[in-house]
Amino acid sequence: MVNIILLIVSALIGLILGYALISIRLKSAKEAAELTLLNAEQEAVDIRGKAEVDAEHIKKTAKRESKANRKELLLKAKEEARKYREEIEQEFKSERQELKQLETRLAERSLTLDRKDENLSSKEKVLDSKEQSLTDKSKHIDERQLQVEKLEEEKKAELEKVAAMTIAEAREVILMETENKLTHEIATRIRDAERDIKDRTVKTAKDLLAQAMQRLAGEYVTEQTITSVHLPDDNMKGRIIGREGRNIRTLESLTGIDVIIDDTPEVVILSGFDPIRREIARMTLESLIADGRIHPARIEELVEKNRLEMDNRIREYGEAAAYEIGAPNLHPDLIKIMGRLQFRTSFGQNVLRHSVEVGKLAGILAGELGENVALARRAGFLHDMGKAIDREVEGSHVEIGMEFARKYKEHPVVVNTIASHHGDVEPDSVIAVLVAAADALSSARPGARNESMENYIKRLRDLEEIATSFDGVQNSFALQAGREIRIMVQPEKISDDQVVILSHKVREKIEHNLDYPGNIKVTVIREMRAVDYAK
């Protein structure tokens, strides 16, 4: 660019110098060059024009070259700037990567330090806890040491006192003191054990029994020892008695039932403790009344016929009960045995209906606990089958039931259930326990069974006498038909801790001395009153 400008300047200077030279020459040779002046001027003009054209051309060329050089320089500068920027960015990128790695290492180190700090804090807490524990133990040891020293002093004083006693007196004093000291601990342990057992079992047991009772609705007709037979008129009484009482004696001898004919209008009473015989007598007497032929031969014929009919009815009762309980493949002899329970009662409760109810309850409880429902229902259904034949075979109904269950190849769980439902042997399965619970639930619920008034009063009187036999008992009351005994104690003789022990002693004596269905609740009440008067 500078060279071009210098070239232009040089050209201009050359032109100026040439013009000056021509002017001088023209001036010096004015006279000689007038002819050529116009030519010279013209040449000068031409030269000037050409110089201007050349200068303009040179200027344009210089501008184009300058513009091209500027673009080239600009591109070169941009390329250099780009390369420099890339180098700078690469350096920044490397530095950022290093910074990032450094930050990561610092974060990891910080996390490690935090963990170490937490571990140190945790160890410090543990050490503080151990230190506190050691301090507490040290205090406890000091307290125990003081107690031991105090006890040693007391024992020393007691030994000094005992030294003047006989061996028997000293033993009695020591035993009394030991019992008094252990009374509180025994009562506390009993309360804790009872509370723990109640917390874990009462709610579950109540829920299970409530569900079982809600899902089963049983009905019973109270059984009696007498049966009334309605007569069309009172004249039939004489025909039943017969000449010289032959008819009534024949009926009584064949059935083993007392036929009572009194002043009750149009009624004959059949009395007997065997419901099957009483039912046969009823069927026979009703058949005689309907037939009208009443004489010893006809009575014998109808008694035999009704015995066969009774066998069929017994089998039908057994089949219906087995179908109701869902006991398939029951041996025909067992079906007949179970049918006979329709005519057996226990405390006024029909034994067959009781067996069906126990089977259903046991099945419900087994279902709630995930046991074999069908086996539980079968075991509950057969648990009292020995009652159908215990009058004909020696042994208790439990022993007879076990024998027949083994004879007819019943499941071992069924055999053990029959053996254990009254506590004669230990239950080997959960089903045996469930059947025992269902048996108690069915038989002990209010209204399920009846007792005679005399036995009822005697049982209540015995219950109250057992309670009042203990020292410190002020009064006792048998409540809820003998299912609860409420004991009022003298507060100056019985302490709060001794109340718990007294309730257990009363319970043990009741269990050893009384026979009763279900459970008896023992409640001991200690009441301390302080009365004063403001004057």
Swiss-Prot record:
Any coiled-coil regions, as ranges: none
Top-rank taxon, per record: Bacteria
Membrane spanning stretches: 4-24
SMART domains given in the database record: HDc, KH
A Pfam cross-reference name: RNase_Y_N
Location in or out of the cell: Cell membrane
Membrane topology, from the record: Single-pass membrane protein
Domain HD as annotated: residue spans: 351-444
Any single GO CC term annotated in Swiss-Prot or TrEMBL for this entry: plasma membrane
Keyword Secreted on entry: no
Record domain KH: where: 225-285
Region listing for Disordered, in residue ranges: 118-141
Record-listed E.C. numbers: 3.1.-.-
Keywords: Cell membrane, Endonuclease, Hydrolase, Membrane, Nuclease, RNA-binding, Transmembrane, Transmembrane helix
GO biological process: mRNA catabolic process
Molecular function terms from GO: RNA binding; RNA endonuclease activity
Family: Belongs to the RNase Y family.
Free-text function comment from the UniProt entry: Endoribonuclease that initiates mRNA decay.
Name of the molecule in the record: Ribonuclease Y
Organism of origin: Streptococcus pyogenes serotype M2 (strain MGAS10270)
Taxonomic lineage of the native organism: Bacteria, Bacillati, Bacillota, Bacilli, Lactobacillales
Gene that this polypeptide is encoded by: rny
